Amino acid sequence: MNKLDPLRLCDQAPLLVFAHANGYPPQAYRTFLTPFLDDYQVFSLYLRSFWPGTDPQEMRDWRAFRDDYLPEVHSLIEKYGKRTESSGSVIGVGHSLGAMTTLMAAIKDPGLFRLLVLMEPVLFPRWQGTAMRLLAPFKLIKRIHPLIQGTLKRKTWFESREAMYQRYRVKPVFSGLSDQVLRDYVEGLAVEDAEGGVSLRYTPAWEARIYETGGIADWYIWRNLDKVECPVLVIRGEDTYVLFDRVINSMVGKLPAGEGYTMAGTGHLVPLEKPLKTAEVVRGFIRKYLN
C-alpha cells in the first residue's frame, strides 16, 4: 500500500488531527480548518481509501481505519508534539467516517487524546448495527443499501476540473456547500490523467465498500464508550439523515464526559455546509477545556 502523508496546514501547538468523511478529501475542509491555524498544529489525515494501490475488499470493517490512524498519530506526536501520559496530547476531530475512526482510536488508546470532537459519526442504533453484522457474510448489504448502486455507477472521468465542478454544482447533495468549499472538494478529488482530463482520486469501489461495511463494528463502540474518559463533543446536523436524536443521546449518556450539540440549518455535511459556524462551536469547546 502506498500511504499518503497527512496534509499539514500549520506548525503551531498543540496538535489537532482531523479525519475526513467517506469520499471527501482533506482539502474540502480548508474553510472549516482555517480558523484553527493560528492556535494549533493542524494535520488532516488521508484515510486508506485515498491511498494508491489499496484494495477495498481487504477491509472487513471500519476498525481497519482505526488501525491505520493510530500509528500515523503516534508518528506525528514523535515528530511534532509532546505526549503527557496523564492528559493526552492530541485534539482529535473527525467528520462522519473520520469521526468513527477517531472515536475507535480513542477507545483503543484512551490516553492519547486531550479531547474529541465528533461531527456526525455514523453510529447506528444497536439493532441496526446487529442486523448489518448478521447480513454481512451473505453480501446482502450491497444489494439493499440505498447508496451503493448509485455510487458504483458514478462518473469517474471529466474533461477538466471546471467540468467536474460544474457537474457537481447542480447536484442536490452539494446544494448546501459554498462555491469555495465545492471547489476545494474538486481540487482534492481530481487527479490529472494521461488523456488530458481528470479522474477521481477516490474510487467508487472504495466509497461503496465503506457503505457496505458500515455498522459492522458498531457493537465494539457501544460496548466501549465508557473507556473514552476525555471530554467529547458530538455534533449532529439538524436535518441529518444519519445521526438520530436517540443515538446521540445514548452516546452522550455513556461517555464519561460527553456533550451533544445540534447545528441548525445543516444536514450530514455539517463542517462543509456551515464551516465557519461549526469551527466557532468547536473552538469554543476546545477553549473550555484547554484554557
Whereabouts are the PLM-identified features?
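Active-site loop/oxyanion-hole signature of alpha/beta-hydrolase fold enzymes
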Residues: F43, L47-V93, L134-L135, E280
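Short beta-to-alpha linker loops that shape the active-site pocket of alpha/beta-hydrolase fold enzymes
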Residues: Y46-W51, V122, T266-G267
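A short loop-to-beta-strand scaffold at the N-terminal edge of the catalytic core in hydrolase folds
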Residues: M1-R8
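Conserved hydrolase catalytic core segment
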Residues: S89-A131
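Catalytic histidine-centered segment of alpha/beta-hydrolase-like enzymes
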Residues: T266-P275
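Conserved serine/cysteine hydrolase catalytic core
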Residues: A190-G253, T262
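Conserved alpha/beta-hydrolase catalytic His-Asp/Glu region
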Residues: L152-R209
